[in-house]
Amino acid sequence: MISSKTSFIALIGNPVSHSFSPIMQNAAFQYLGLDLIYFAIPCKDEDLELVLNSLKKINCKGLNITIPHKEKVFNLCSEISPIARKLKAINTLKLNSENEWSATNTDLEGFIYPLKNLNLAKKKSIVLGSGGAAKSVIQGLINLNLSKISVIGRNKSSLDELIKNFGNQIELHSFLSNDNQTQNLIEEADLIINTTPVGMKTAKNEMNLLPYGDYFWRSLNSKTIVYDLIYNPAPTHLLKFSANKGCMTIDGLQMLVAQGLKSLSFWTNGLEVPFHIMNDALKNHL
């Protein structure tokens, strides 16, 4: 029950109305018996500094940061973890002993969670998209020791940014729907990860589309694991299509829950919740 002593943790971004984080985090707080609530706060770019400075002065114990603020929040933090610096993105904050924001990124651990036991070392992978989410995915694949990481994207500037970050650890390919080289990559891939928004429920007219179009996927075969970071709808059109091809599929819910567990541990100095507590709360909501 909320009382005058209840503290809070919030999600800051724009938009935030689609987020499932309040559902799973409040389930975790209830499981742990914490006098905490979690809710989402929409915040425009120009208000970010004001909002974060204001939250220091009230009973806020931590934050999640989502798009479009994951990079812009750097200048408002006094302590930043090595992984957040490496990825140039922050998704979790807490107030330190000096009442300043300490920051980390839990997306990497969230992404890896459903892949840990799949023995992907020395396997070949494709990352679709070159935006912010691709950075966590690529670093995760490097950590899992995959032998080949091919990135297929449309945006030259963001592809160039990935090369600055990861150098010769990745191969870049501009999107061409009739590109035979791309089809060879798809045919040999052991793992394909979609980091684009195509297929997301909130993406206008894109929910029933495949990333890069149907023709792009003509060489997909059943040995490939297909991982879609999108979690709403579940399953996405891509995962339904891939399952019909006989592929193992992974949806974004597992990543969402796993990164949420790591954020919770960061806020509470090490408290842990069983995976199923958050996962069941989300599935009941869906």
UniProtKB/Swiss-Prot annotation:
Shikimate binds at residues 19-21, 66, 91, 107, 231. Disulfide bonds: none annotated. The gene is aroE. One of its GO terms (cellular component) is cytosol. Keywords: Amino-acid biosynthesis, Aromatic amino acid biosynthesis, NADP, Oxidoreductase. One of its GO terms (molecular function) is NADP binding. This is Shikimate dehydrogenase (NADP(+)). Belongs to the shikimate dehydrogenase family. It holds the Pfam family Shikimate_DH. NADP(+) binds at residues 129-133, 229, 252. Involved in the biosynthesis of the chorismate, which leads to the biosynthesis of aromatic amino acids. Catalyzes the reversible NADPH linked reduction of 3-dehydroshikimate (DHSA) to yield shikimate (SA). Its EC number is 1.1.1.25. It comes from Prochlorococcus marinus (strain MIT 9301). One of its GO terms (biological process) is aromatic amino acid family biosynthetic process. The active site is at 70 (proton acceptor).
